[in-house]
Amino acid sequence: MGDEIVPPANQLAADNLENDGSTVQKAQFSDRVLIRSILGGGAKLAGQKVRIGGWVKTGRQQGKGTFAFLEVNDGSCPANLQVMVDSSLYDLSRLVATGTCVTVDGVLKIPPEGKGLKQSIELSVETVIAVGTVDPTTYPLPKTKLTPEFLRDVLHLRSRTNLISAVARIRNALAFATHSFFQEHSFLYIHTPIITTSDCEGAGEMFQVTTLINHTERVEQDLIDNPPPTEADVEAARLIVKERGEAVAQLKVAKASKEEITASVAQLSVAKASLAHVEERLRLKPGLPKNDGKIDYSNDFFGRQAFLTVSGQLQVETYACALSSVYTFGPTFRAENSHTSRHLAEFWMVEPEIAFADIHDDMNCAEAYVKYMCKWLMDKCGDDMELMDKNVDEGCTKRLNMVAKASFKRVTYTEAIERLEKAVAQGKVVFDNKVEWGIDLASEHERYLTEVEFDQKPIIVYNYPKGIKAFYMRLNDDEKTVAAMDVLVPKVGELIGGSQREERYDVIKQRIEEMGLPMEPYEWYLDLRRYGTVKHCGFGLGFERMIQFATGIDNIRDVIPFPRYPGKADL
């Protein structure tokens, strides 16, 4: 995975251009022209003078060093623009190295026939404006094949590779599509907090936010640099305060002058401040502050335990119970010590909530949203998806087109288990995880259902056992299952998880108690049921999972710009 992936040269989707191709498109806040616009316009742009800026993907000197050809990319599209530079304009040896940044002015020309160039246009340079040189002996990204593992160690540079830059454009398009979908359907975008005191999942695998450790480190260093006072020091300070107080009293009895009394009172104040400082330092103890053997958070920054959010769902529900249709889209965090290709410590979630809606409305919304994103990618990112199809996962574009048009089959959890058990009994498949009613479906089960049982089609599984789902999911009439649903897709398995929320106060309170969760942190959540409760539902989509599904990239660490996982938090 690196610059060995060759981008498409002349397959830019017309939708990517904001003009008819007869004129170049300038960057709005720069004097350069987008390479995407030049390649999209093709031969119709011949003769126009433009300024382009970008990074050299490959460069070669020809004609015994009299000129050079540069393949330049500016990130606006996966394809490169061929740029020809004469040696009279610049030292060619400083231009041809991979990674060199160039800004040049020139004239667009139609390449001579027979050059074998796939593009219908190239740039003949007239002026070299600026050059950011590269030492090819030390540049970490040579033209040789680069592994994903290597690129994760150079996060600050890996976006220069063809694959990662394509992922960035696809990620951008999916984010745009997300906002577009929900805004078109009259949802309001709500910013939910990153720091929270609630655990939405009840799993306890949360990152804690605290300043106690910083405070403790400062105290311990202070105690080393300035040893704490003794009891004798405190008694001496108290004696000075007593003496200063008696001196003030004597002056008042003797009817001393105002100036003398004021000066004596000032000395008393200094003595009291000194005593307070000594007593405070005497109370300083190394280690975290404790109360009854437990860490005391009352003096922490928020006055209580606080965490990085695992989901914005609970908070965004408060707005759904006032504004009806809302969504949040932001980072979430899980402190799972997992080293798999499916898990990150920091990832992004899309979480809509819909008032006056039930589980069936929830499934309808989830299906429409996934279809919308798939169609958006094919319409807006055809060139990047072509790159993925050719170099990463052959058939990924076919998969997107299929999902965009398919009807998502809906099956109950019980039916899904029966299908899996039947497949095992018939010897069609052997799973690592045992199949029985009551289990949480593993990834291998989810993928078998979508890829085999339902012939590479997306499905929605609903009505899960209550024992494997969160407290806020609505209890069904059978009191064994909850109105929960998961959207399963080929390649990744679960893409979306959602449910109708429990709107009945007595039922949700009982569920919190059953799961052994403390009631106090959720009192505000219970208020939503105490005061004007409403039927509502929602779901969460793992944004990185969606990118994996679209691109076919196996490791989730390669679809987020700056992956965080156990042992890694670079930059």
Swiss-Prot record:
EC number assigned by the record: 6.1.1.22
One record GO biological process: asparaginyl-tRNA aminoacylation
DNA-binding region range list: 50-128
Keywords: Acetylation, Aminoacyl-tRNA synthetase, ATP-binding, Cytoplasm, DNA-binding, Ligase, Nucleotide-binding, Protein biosynthesis
Coiled coil stretches, renumbered: none
InterPro entries documented for this protein: Aa-tRNA-synt_II, aa-tRNA-synth_II, aa-tRNA-synth_II/BPL/LPL, Asn-tRNA-ligase, Asp/Asn-tRNA-synth_IIb, NA-bd_OB-fold, NA-bd_OB_tRNA, WHEP-TRS_dom
Spans through the membrane: none
Any one GO cellular component localisation term in the record: cytosol
Keyword DNA-binding: yes
SUPFAM superfamilies cross-referenced by the UniProt entry: Class II aaRS and biotin synthetases, Nucleic acid-binding proteins
Any GO MF annotation of the entry: asparagine-tRNA ligase activity
Residues recorded with modification N-acetylglycine: 2
Catalytic activity field: tRNA(Asn) + L-asparagine + ATP = L-asparaginyl-tRNA(Asn) + AMP + diphosphate + H(+)
HAMAP family for the chain: Asn_tRNA_synth (MF_00534)
Family from the record: Belongs to the class-II aminoacyl-tRNA synthetase family.
Name of the protein this chain belongs to: Asparagine--tRNA ligase, cytoplasmic 3
Species this protein is from: Arabidopsis thaliana (Mouse-ear cress)
Gene that this polypeptide is encoded by: SYNC3
